[in-house]
Amino acid sequence: MALALCACGSAQTADTPAADASASGAAAGGAVASGVEDGVLTVAMECAYAPYNWTQTDDSNGAVPISNVPGSYANGYDVMIAKKICEANGWELERVQSDWDSLVPGVQTGTFDAVIAGQSMTAERAEQVDFAGPYFYATIVCVTKANSPYASATGIADLAGGSCTAQIATIWYDQCLPQIEGAKIQTAAETAPAMLMALETDSVDFICTDMPTAQGAVEAYPDMTILDFSGTDGDFQFSDEVRAENVNIGVSVMKGNTVLKDAIDSVLSTMTADDFNALMAQAISVQPLSE
């Protein structure tokens, strides 16, 4: 169980005194508590990032209560993965809602035991937290309207000059969109739903995201279509290392918490890419259309 069952404020950053104290304690050789001594795994997510995670008003399709948002329930691929981890280890699952920018600080300070929220296993994040997994492999794609002139694009060169956005603090916004020649990059979206709404309302011509988010989008918005350039010369260009970091989706835990990391890995290591894809397809099939 985490030290506190509330989301960190968005103003808190990785270099806050609390985070520094936690990091220095681990560096000094002090034992890091697993967080699950009481049999409860407290897991944070946005609860607004379908099909990875979303909020709904009841427990249908296996949704679980959100402990810090009474009357609300979380569901999605991340919830399904968290339930498998808890079932295998004999833990009770406690879900906490947090905004995206507070997820890493929340793990660092012990506010949550783990984050299962569609996080890419980037080198920058790995300096702040430890990762178990991966628990999904997510291709980077673009999404546009089916009737858009960009719908026939076969590579990023065909997106030149278009207006676009992506979610804040992601490789999609920071590294992908700038590769498109003449792109009119708009303000980053705070959440995945806000990113999708920018496209749906024609505020932008296209967005950049990962394949599961895109697949969930076209389920909710049939007028959208996916542009998948992966494996072609027209794809976004990264080093193999950077691409692997941002395709691999992992579970973050406090630095030095090897007990919890190993317990999570013991479950994820038994699952194949086909298992992950089947579970993701299940999540997409039950996501609310409003997401």
What does each of the following model-derived ranges do?
Residues 20, 29-118:
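Extracytoplasmic small-molecule ligand-binding "clamshell" domains
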Residues 3-7:
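C-terminal motif of bacterial Sec signal peptides marking the signal peptidase cleavage site
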Residues 87, 92-158, 237-243:
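Acidic, polar ligand-binding/catalytic clefts
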Residues 8-24:
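Bacterial lipoprotein signal-peptidase II cleavage site
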